[in-house]
Amino acid sequence: MQKHLDSILIKPAGPDCNMNCTYCFYLKKLKLFPEKKVHRMTEEILDKVIRQLLAQTLRELSFSWQGGEPTLMGLPFFQKAVDLQQKYGRAQVVGNGLQTNGLLIDKKWAEFLNTYKFLIGLSLDGPEHVHDKYRYLRNGKGSWSKVENSAKLMLDSGVAVNALSVVNDYSVRFPEEIYEYFKAIGLEYMQFIPCLETSSEDPSKSASFSVSADPYGIFLCRLFDLWLGDFKEGKPTTSIRFFDSVFYLYAGLPPPECTLLEECGNYVIVEFNGDVYSCDFFVEDLWRLGSVPSGNLIEMLNSKRQKSFGEKKKALVQDCTECSWLSLCRGGCTKDRFQYTKDTKLNHLCSAYKMFFQHADSRFKKLASDWKNEQAREYQARQQERLEESSRSAKKIGRNDPCSCGSGTKYKKCCGR
C-alpha cells in the first residue's frame, strides 16, 4: 500500500546558522556541501516541493521549516511559501512549523507568524546559566537574553511557541528550575531533547557534553512528577511532548513522536538544494533518496531505500525483544544506538527509559483509563442527545406530513402507524 506524505521537513538554509553552539550536530553537515559557503533554497525548488505535496488528496498537511537557522532566508521567502501554499492548495488544512533560535525575530516576523498561525519551536534550554552553558553567539557571548526577548515578543503577539530544550550533561541537573522557568515566562508547551553526540575520537562513545543514561532517567522522573503535579481536574496544564506521546501509547493511539514508533520512514527531509533524505539525523549519501528538481517526493517516500531505512528501526537486540517495555520504547531513536551489546547496538538511553517507565507506568495507566472512561461518557451523552432530538422531531411531525425516515410516504402510513 502506497504511503501518503502528510508532513515534510524543509531546510531552506541548509546547515547555515548565526550561532555557534557547542553541541550542534548540524555543523558536521557543512562537509556535505563544500562547493558553497552560503546555502539558500531557490524559488524554483520551493515551488516544486509545495506543488508536489499539495497535489495529494489529503485533508491535512504540515510543513516543518528547520535548519541550521531557517530565518536566515528572510521574511519574503516565507511569505512566498505561504503564497504558494494558497496557490496550490485544494481546500486542505495546511500547517506550518518553524524551528528557530529566535535571534532574527522582530515585530514584523512576529506579526507574520501570528497572521499565518505558524507553530514555533524556540531553541531555549532554560534560564541563563543553563542556556548559555553551550548556546553561544558567533562572538562567543551567551545568547540567552536575546532568545528570551524573542520568546516574550512572540507570545505577546499571539504566536504559539514551544520551548525546545536540549538536555545535556549540565542541564540534566536542573529539571525543576527549567520547568518552572518555562512556566514563568509563558512557555507551557515544552519539548526536551536528549543531547547525544558521539565522540570524535571514538564513535562508540558519547561526547563530553552528551547526557548520560542514568541522570537522564532521573531527569525524566522528576520532570514527570512536576508535570503530573500541575494537573487540574484530571487534565494537564502544561504539555511535554515526550509525556504526551507516551500517554498516546497507553491510550492505544499512535504517538506523535517518531522515536516511539515501531518503524521509521513516514516523512522525508528536503535540503536547500532539493536533495531529499530519509531523516534529519541521517543526511548522508547512504540515505539520499533523490532530488526534487528531477524526482517525485511521493515516489521517494515509497522507494525501496526509504523502506529499508524504516525497517532499520525494527532490528533490535535480544535485550530489547525480551524487554517488558518494548511496546512503549520500540528501541528508541535509531541514531542513539551506539552503545554496543554483543554484536549489535543497544540504545544509549536504554536504562533511562526503563527507569522512567517503571516510575510512571501505574500513573499513565490511570490517566489512560480515566480518559477512556471520559470518552465513553461523552459518546453516551452524544447518543442520548441524538435520541432525544429524534424524539422531539417525531413529535412535531403531523400525520399527513412526509415521514422523517426518508421513505417518501406520509408519516401516518410509515413510522406513525
Predicted regions and their residues:
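N-terminal [4Fe-4S]-dependent radical SAM core
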Residues: M1-K11, Q56, Q380-A394
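Canonical Radical SAM [4Fe-4S] cluster-binding loop centered on the CxxxCxxC motif
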Residues: K3-E44, C415-R417
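Extended hydrophobic secondary-structure segments that form protein cores and membrane-embedded regions
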Residues: I8-I10, S62-G68, G95-T100, I240-F243
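Cysteine-centered iron-sulfur cluster-binding motifs in ferredoxin-type domains/subunits
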Residues: P12-N20, E69-L72, C264, C320-E322, ...
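Radical SAM/AdoMet-radical enzyme domain recognition
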Residues: V49-R51, A55-S64, M73-T198, S208, ...
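Radical SAM enzyme [4Fe-4S]-AdoMet core and its adjacent flexible, acidic
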Residues: L137-S145, K152, D156-T259, E263, ...
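Flexible mid-to-C-terminal extensions adjoining Fe-S/redox cofactors in radical SAM and related proteins
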Residues: V283-A394, R399, K413-R417
